[in-house]
């Protein structure tokens, strides 16, 4: 006979488990499904929604976390300085995200949702991209040129997001070089004032 002392201890599911499981689903190119996630965690959908919000909020949080991690990794490996290095950081971020197959597939499979999450100025992903762009500029521009106003950062981020994700959603290649050129033109015009 088995006693309770011999039974394995089962870890109770948490919000962090939900986020990890959903991220694995996303990175494997699977559709993040709330019912599948709740079932896998052994919790009800009400509990899952209380932990992570709705599906859009969950995916936005996952992509915001990925954005933050990617900018940190790129910054950790940066070797140059100045405006060229700042834009190289932005370029690497755009190239890596545009080339991330699960993200591209998501954008093409669910275009309206992807655009809300990736391009909307109010999205948590855009907040993380703005922070990453601001950090790249802060780390590479002389102190005399800082801080860069928030509206200039917003223009850089919105132009970049629009020229990156709108083409991907319709099955075209992103225009990263144009986005970088336009962004640099805006920044240099600001710095020349």
Regions found by a protein language model. Give the residues of each.
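Amphipathic alpha-helical packing segments from all-alpha helical-bundle domains
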Residues: 114-144, 150-157
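Amphipathic alpha-helical segments used for helix-helix packing
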Residues: 97-120
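Hydrophobic/aromatic-rich alpha-helical bundle segments in the mid-to-C-terminal region
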Residues: 140-185
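Hydrophobic alpha-helical connector segments
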Residues: 61, 74-102, 153-156
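Charge-biased, low-complexity intrinsically disordered regions
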Residues: 47-48, 82-83, 162
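Solvent-exposed, amphipathic alpha-helical segments
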Residues: 21-28, 69-77, 159-167
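Short hydrophobic/aromatic patch on the recognition helix
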Residues: 42-52
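Basic, helix-initiating cap at the start of DNA-binding domains
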Residues: 1-40, 56-57, 65
């Amino acid at each position: 006979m088995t006693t309770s002392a011999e039974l394995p201890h089962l870890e109770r599911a948490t919000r962090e488990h939900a986020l990890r499981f959903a991220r694995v689903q996303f990175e494997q190119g699977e559709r993040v499904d709330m019912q599948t996630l709740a079932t896998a965690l052994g919790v009800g959908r009400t509990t899952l929604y209380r932990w992570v919000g709705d599906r859009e909020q969950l995916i936005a949080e996952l992509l915001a976390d990925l954005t933050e991690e990617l900018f940190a990794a790129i910054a950790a490996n940066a070797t140059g300085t100045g405006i060229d290095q700042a834009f190289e950081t932005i370029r690497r971020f755009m190239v890596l995200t545009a080339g991330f197959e699960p993200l591209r597939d998501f954008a093409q499979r669910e275009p309206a949702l992807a655009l809300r999450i990736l391009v909307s100025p109010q999205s948590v992903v855009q907040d993380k991209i703005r922070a990453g762009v601001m950090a790249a500029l802060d780390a590479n521009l002389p102190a005399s040129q800082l801080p860069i106003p928030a509206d200039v950062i917003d223009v850089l981020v919105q132009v970049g997001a629009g020229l990156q994700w709108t083409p991907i959603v319709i099955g075209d290649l992103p225009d990263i070089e144009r986005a970088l050129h336009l962004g640099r033109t805006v920044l240099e015009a600001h710095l020349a004032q």
